[in-house]
């Protein structure tokens, strides 16, 4: 699911922490500084290549490169389909619980490699194997799977799309009229995703040679994925992959069985191990407890240590200090008659202060990446426009040596062209269909809003893709938030501005995100000798799979769990209410905020910028200990229970690294992926049991001594 410009690796850390910001392609298995272990290996490979003696492609020189059609095999897409379902369920669960989605690249790559190896071994045994499993086919699988489960993230099921629903709207008193509400339905969701998810794939296709070959943008995540795949297809890499899959399977089984065991004790609200007051009843009341979730222990093992510590610090600051103090102001700062879930009461402080932190962090990183992108682009243009001149004034022949790897990769990358007419014509055609069709789904979203979005989208997509190539940051969610404010304010409250803002966010995020993702895939394909055509086709097929699979998975959750999206439940969908309230702010302004809430928002907005600035200016040894504002913002709204899970995960990883660093780097991502996948897949049978009205037989609940005495007295009477 990074070699960042700042020494602290902060950019990668920030991307690990918000569902709308964290990209699934960024850095699987990062160390304490936020640098992916895959990327460290990729960097080492790059350094070795520059030195000369080490060459990746010389190791594969005796293996024929299949044509782009041969890279697109039936078995690749069959395996991709089933893996896409599995990872879509996992991402959907993460989306609807806390919104923290770690990179699942390692598990996707491992399982794709393992299942096709299994397939080919079985066919080879009966003598029917026609085509061996190649790294190009492996790249096709990886691209297809990540594109498919990426829709579960970028489709907005935990953010803008679900934020339109009545469930989320009725938690606020503003803009909850029919004009600003649209309840989920599988039909229009699939249609919407098909309309907005493909146009981004066409936006930057003509620029792939410029971005990958001419500018030689690094795309660290794409490079890391390619290095992983190249490693699988060496004898040593295949042996390690087999061991990693074994560890993943072991912890997958443990996590799945544990989820099944826990289910027996959840017969009512507040029952089961997930409501265990491990730190005491008062701490439990303030959402400090360990909920025995393998998922977030696994997430903690994948996320950098600073992310996990930042989340815990955010929980302590908010639920340990701020909210109890503000609760004491009940009757003064807000009406005593209001419930804690009212946005005019304590809940308003929780939601809007977290929004202030997210926006401050997002604005800072947007400006920083924009400056770096512009500076890098200017330097690149100057470099390319300078003509070397000899002493007599005539042009010199370039003497820069091209390595064997670069020469071979460039030759094959430029071999299979994607016609520009397909890209330009496809963009115009899909845009025209979207402009005509989207207003049928959202009548409030006028055709000229969509036209304006599509006119500016390619420019923004280029900025995002170029920035991601330099820094590995994808700011798709930031562009989406800008769309919320711009289009929401343009439409106005009386014309369904909240719904317009959320829908425009989806349009903009989908274009900008998929364009950047495709360029990452082209970089992976470039480094594994996979054809750009096969990469493009795989991305299109994966996106089409995701447009059907993701809404179906969400619909399963939506129908199986009645309280989805409600604060304090198993699936609170925290970012759905955050995004909706951003849209309300864009339309109505700050008039609805509780007393002193705006002042606190200003303080935390400024604090987010100041903390980020301190991280960038401080020496790397100091910067890596400065917390991340985006990570701190997450528990402000939903509580600290998952922060404790993640902290336990980071402690396990830290101790493992102290005992045996090499083994931890090799197997920790696989163990973490097993914990996440097993618990995530248990959600599928749990949903089926809920739909079949099969209820758990036992309620395990914890009471204080006084309440227990009252219950005993009541039962005695």
Swiss-Prot record:
- Mind telling me which InterPro entries this protein's record contains? OPT, YSL-like
| Primary localisation category | membrane
| A molecular-function term among this protein's GO annotations | oligopeptide transmembrane transporter activity
Tell me which UniProt keywords the record has, alphabetically: Membrane, Transmembrane, Transmembrane helix, Transport
Where in the cell is the protein located? Answer: Membrane
What does the UniProt record say this protein does? May be involved in the transport of nicotianamine-chelated metals.
Query: What does the sequence similarity comment in the record state about its family?
Result: Belongs to the YSL (TC 2.A.67.2) family.
Name of the protein: Probable metal-nicotianamine transporter YSL12
Q: Which organism is it from?
A: Oryza sativa subsp. japonica (Rice)
